[in-house]
Amino acid sequence: MWDELEELLIGADTGVSTTHKVLGEVQMRVEKERIKDGEQVKAILKEELVAILRTGGEKGRIWGEEEAPPSDRPAVILIVGVNGTGKTTSVAKLAQAYREDGEKVVVAAADTFRAAAIEQLKSWGEIVGADIVAHKQGADPGAVVFDAMSAAESRNADVVLIDTAGRLHKKFNLMEELGKIRRVIERKVPEGPDEVMLVLDATTGQNALVQAKAFAEVVPITALCLTKLDGTSKGGIVFAVSDQLGIPVRFIGTGEQPEDLTPFDAEEFVEALFQ
């Protein structure tokens, strides 16, 4: 049975280290509670997996009533991630979700490295009804963010979503760029962004953990958005990310449509692994 459970977890991209850690915890509980029934063992495993996903807690300032941003300014959400993860699409989906909640949204197209990202956001903006603030390709991302923050203030927006470039292979440039963006945000919001959300592609397996660690060295990640869960991927890598970095999952993306973004449910996610 233990081999079967190990195969299940590793097959779901949970990773060897996290798999062994979780199964070790389960074995200790099984021995302590003298459990013999296989279904009970699975139930304990599910409990341990859910607990891992909740270790990150509520790091951001906008997801609980007690830590909501002041009502006199927009909430600021910085979205980071490598190109190809569905980052820009996720920004549009978030804009759609906030619009459906009746919020006024301004999006900063600060991924000025890719012309496609700017045009993609402009197109999405028309579809979901969000205001897009964009400059030309190659423009200063900090200037885009400043203009977006100013526009949000003048238009009484509720939320500012900031799309950023994801060039991890040029780590110094990335650090410089994200550092500058944070400084621009802090000119308007001294405490910095309310949320820093990292978008990860569920199909990339262990590479997603490498990306998460790299971004966490550059900027304080407070949340994850897991994309491309509509394919064969089980997305088990989030257990390793949550376990090793203590970052909670906020959303999962399951398709290309604006509505294909749902709040993350730890119990449902764990149950899906066993189906």
Where are these regions (language model features)?
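Short glycine-rich anion-binding loops that position phosphate/pyrophosphate groups of nucleotides
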Residues: A165-R167
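Conserved catalytic-core segment of NTP-binding enzymes
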Residues: I118-S123, Q137-R155, H169-Q275
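Primarily NTPase-proximal linker/entry elements flanking Walker-type ATP/GTP-binding cores
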Residues: M1-A110, A117-I162
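Short beta-strand segments
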Residues: V80-G81, D163, V199, G253
